[in-house]
Amino acid sequence: MLDAFSRVVTGADSKAAYVGGADLQALKKFVSEGNKRLDAVNAIVSNASCIVSDAVSGMICENPSLISPSGECYTNRRMAACLRDAEIILRYVSYSLLSGDSSVLEDRCLSGLKETYASLGVPAAGNARAVGIMKATVVAFINNTSNQKKLLTPSGDCSALASEAAGYFDKVTSALA
């Protein structure tokens, strides 16, 4: 995982050049937006258990057969695994949002995710729906339009940051498809 600074330095070093021009301007923007980024990640972390449980509950409400005796969330163990998996996905999305880089999400969470679920017989559609619910909730927190927040959320125009977070969730959904 390379953060924004490491990516710029690595790129400049590979060219045997100084950091400057557009790279320097991009870093200046990254720093100036830093407090919004930190506030957004803090909003996700502070509300993580609610985000995850609401997403899994929403998935089950839309597909009650998941908790029937033959359903994928029927036993406590399976429900706990579902909640755990959603929490892991949300955690890696928050890491990506913090660093401004999706490589940690792709390398440590998404690589082989579809194959793992397929081998366990876990339907991708339900997981994708839970990810979609988490995406909507996180975007609402970042845009300060959620009515369920525990702490203050980022102030000012955070639409670019919300779009970035949505993109990370879209990567997860694509990996499940």
From Swiss-Prot:
Mesobiliverdin binds at residue 18. One of its GO terms (biological process) is photosynthesis. It comes from the Eukaryota. GO terms for cellular component: chloroplast thylakoid membrane; phycobilisome. Pfam families: Phycobilisome. (2R,3E)-phycocyanobilin 2 binds at residues 77, 82, 84-85. (2R,3E)-phycocyanobilin 1 binds at residues 28, 35, 39, 154, 156, 158. InterPro entries: Globin-like_sf, Phycobilisome_asu/bsu, Phycobilisome_asu/bsu_sf. Belongs to the phycobiliprotein family. Heterotetramer of 2 different alpha chains and 2 identical beta chains which form 2 alpha-beta heterodimers within the heterotetramer. This is Phycocyanin-645 beta chain. It comes from Chroomonas sp.
